[in-house]
């Protein structure tokens, strides 16, 4: 394939951001023989695919602190990529528990693995509010499944729809919002503003609305760095600790995109902004009104991830320990957090509980803290979903492309899909020029 601009120079493409979107875009462009440079501001490639080494029980091994699992039904591009790279995976699970305060200083604990864990606290067998919650779960699954199969979904926020349908407070606070917090890493008020249609489609696609025939969840053996390293090795021109300060686009001509880093200015023919939408907007010194409207419409929830071995954050009853463990505080505006029990998510060679706590309410024992990281996740309210639909209107204009998980549901497959789509568009553009020149 020819890789020249219309002035006969070799076409240069910059990909800014080395999360799954940037990695996949740069990897596919490099494999296609194009001149691509991957530029990452941080100290490692991978973004939320962040594997760190720990030493426990006399063994040193890697654990993941961001991206953890995928399934065999809704991650087709990721599965294809892992097959292409020869990445080994192992079975994982999606068990879920809830731990939150009740009146009188009591604590509610339950988990969804089986009837024994649902009624981990036997008193709940006689609690009418708990039993109402269970009935509401079954009702919600029926209603949401019917909507998912019925075509057009109501344009309404999740919280407003729950009010219309008279779902109990216990269903919201003890089940639906905890489950959503585990999935989207955001607080309750943000989830209630989530578009009902997006929520229902996601739950349906991921098999969350039925007890049987759920997808099999898997994880990368040895940690997600095993796939990241293989992708990075296929990208000859790559840079770490190289934060981009600004991106300016010219009105035409070769190398019309000017990128500023700490090392100075560099010119490219195309730029792919494979970072969060707010970061992309901050880099565009000459952002147009349509770009500004879309990129500014998506908000982000900052999340602190603490890697530790303090099991006191998990349910008091060990039978309720799950892969994903939700906890909330007793405040009027309760704090929420999720504790990911990595021993149940990944095949770890140790018996010591290894936990990633997202926004922990109670700080883990400092002597048991292994590391801490800051992540951010997109907030999918009505404004964000509307903005996503407008991205295609200017994708590729002024030789500027946008990619990231924020263009979909916010998950790994979404970031990968967006990066591959941009790479395919650029590759097709080059092929079209080759055909025109022939």
Where do the protein language model's features map onto the residues?
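Conserved flavin/dinucleotide-binding core of flavoenzymes
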Residues: 53, 113, 333-438
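N-terminal Rossmann-like FAD-binding beta1-loop-alpha1 element of flavoenzymes
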Residues: 11-38
């Amino acid at each position: 394939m020819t890789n020249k601009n219309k002035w006969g120079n070799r076409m240069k493409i910059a990909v800014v951001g080395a999360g799954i979107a940037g990695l996949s875009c740069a990897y596919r462009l490099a494999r296609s023989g194009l001149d691509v440079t991957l530029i990452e501001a941080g100290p490692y490639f991978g973004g939320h695919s962040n594997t760190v080494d720990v030493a426990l029980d006399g063994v040193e091994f890697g654990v993941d602190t961001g991206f953890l699992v995928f399934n065999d039904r809704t991650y087709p591009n990721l599965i294809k990529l892992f097959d292409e790279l020869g990445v080994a995976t192992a079975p994982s699970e999606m068990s879920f528990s809830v731990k939150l305060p009740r009146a009188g200083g009591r604590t509610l604990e339950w988990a969804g693995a089986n009837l024994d864990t649902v009624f981990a606290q036997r008193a709940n067998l006689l609690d009418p509010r708990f039993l109402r919650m269970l009935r509401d779960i079954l009702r919600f699954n029926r209603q949401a499944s019917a909507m998912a199969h019925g075509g057009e979904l109501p344009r309404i926020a999740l919280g407003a729809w729950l009010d219309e349908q008279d779902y109990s407070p216990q269903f919201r606070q003890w089940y639906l919002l905890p489950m959503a917090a585990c999935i989207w890493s955001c607080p309750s008020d943000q989830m209630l503003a989530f578009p009902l249609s997006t929520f229902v489609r996601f739950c349906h696609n991921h098999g969350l609305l039925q007890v049987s025939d759920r997808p099999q969840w898997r994880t990368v053996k040895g940690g997600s760095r095993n796939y990241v390293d293989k992708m990075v090795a296929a990208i000859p021109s790559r840079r770490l600790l190289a934060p981009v300060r600004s991106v300016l686009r010219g009105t035409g001509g070769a190398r019309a995109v000017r990128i500023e880093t700490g090392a100075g200015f560099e010119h490219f023919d195309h730029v792919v902004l494979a970072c969060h939408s707010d970061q992309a907007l901050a880099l565009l010194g000459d952002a147009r009104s349509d770009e500004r409207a879309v990129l500014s419409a998506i908000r982000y929830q900052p999340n602190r991830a603490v890697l530790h071995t303090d099991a006191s954050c998990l349910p008091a009853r060990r039978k309720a320990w799950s892969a994903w463990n939700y906890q909330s505080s007793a405040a009027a505006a309760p704090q929420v957090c999720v504790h990911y029990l990595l021993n149940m998510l990944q095949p770890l060679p140790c018996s010591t509980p290894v936990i990633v706590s997202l926004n922990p309410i109670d700080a883990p024992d400092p002597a048991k803290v292994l590391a801490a990281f800051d992540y951010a996740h997109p907030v999918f309210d009505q404004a964000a979903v509307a903005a996503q639909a407008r991205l295609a209107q200017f994708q590729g204009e002024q030789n500027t492309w946008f990619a990231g998980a924020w263009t979909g549901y916010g998950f790994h497959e979404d970031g990968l899909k967006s990066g591959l789509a941009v790479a395919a568009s650029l590759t097709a553009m080059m092929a079209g020029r080759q055909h025109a020149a022939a």
